[in-house]
Amino acid sequence: MSTDGADGVDPTRESKSGTGPAGTDTTILRARDLSVSYGKVAALRGLDLAVEPGEIVSLIGPNGAGKTTFANTASGFLEYDGSVEYNGEEVAEIGQTELVERGMIHCTEKRDLFGHMTVEDNLELGAYLRDDDVLEERMAFVYELFPRLEERRGQNARSMSGGEQQMLAIGRALMGDPELLILDEPTLGLAPVILKDIAEAFDPILEQGVTILLTEQNVTFALEHADRIYLLENGTAVREGTPEELKGDEYIRDSYLGG
C-alpha cells in the first residue's frame, strides 16, 4: 500500500483513463442499493460502496457475506436489482466482454487456469483482447513482478504449487492491461512467502495506473495492504473506513482480530 497521501493513496497518481489524480476522478466502480439473490436466498441486500481510481479497496467478512457475489456482479456475471456502475455506466448495459475490453479484469477464486498449458501460454491467453504489440511489454512486466513465473515459463500450470498458480492467475489478469483489477480471495490458503510476493506486487501494479479491488477473508492482510476497507456481513456493508479507522473499531477488534 502506498503511503504518500493522507489516507494511504498517492494524491498525484493518475488513472489509466487519464482524467486526473485520484480523489478528483469519476468513481471507477459504484454500487447503490445493490441486491442479488440466488433463488429465494438473498446474497446482497441494499449494498452501497465505491471504489476510487488509484486505490486498493478490500471487501472483508466471513464466508457467505457477499464478497464473491459482489465481485461476480460487478464483472457482469449475475443479474441484480439496484445499481452497479463502471466508470459511470451501468454494468448490465455494458456486458461481460465489453467490460473486459474496457479494462475490468476479474481474477476469480478458482483461478481458471489451463493446467495442460505452459505458464507462458496461460499468460498469453490473458492478452487475447489486446493488440499484439503490447504482449511482450506486458509479459516482461509480469515476469518482473513474479520471477518464479519466468523461471517456470515452460512448465505446465498443473505441476505448479497452489501459490505459484495464484501468481500465474494474477499475472494472466495483468496481461489484459486492466484499469480495474478484481482479485477474489487471492491469498486464500497461501504460504507466507507467497503472500509476501503478492503484497510486494501491489505498488508496481498501482504505478501502472491500475485500481485494485480485493475480496479477503484474511483481515490482517487487508488491514496491512488496502487503502479502504468495507466489512460485509449478511450481504451488506456494516463498516467502512481506512485500516487505521477499522483497527480502532471495537467490533472489528473483538470479532475479527481476536480482541
Regions found by a protein language model. Give the residues of each.
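ABC ATPase C-loop
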Residues: A173-L174
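The feature captures the beta-strand-to-loop junction immediately N-terminal to the Walker
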Residues: I60-P62
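Catalytic Walker B motif of ABC-type/P-loop ATPase nucleotide-binding domains
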Residues: L181-E185
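Conserved ABC transporter NBD signature motif
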Residues: G82-V91, R102, L135-M139
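ABC-type ATPase nucleotide-binding domains, specifically the catalytic core motifs of the NBD
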Residues: G39, E79, V119-E137, L145-P147, ...
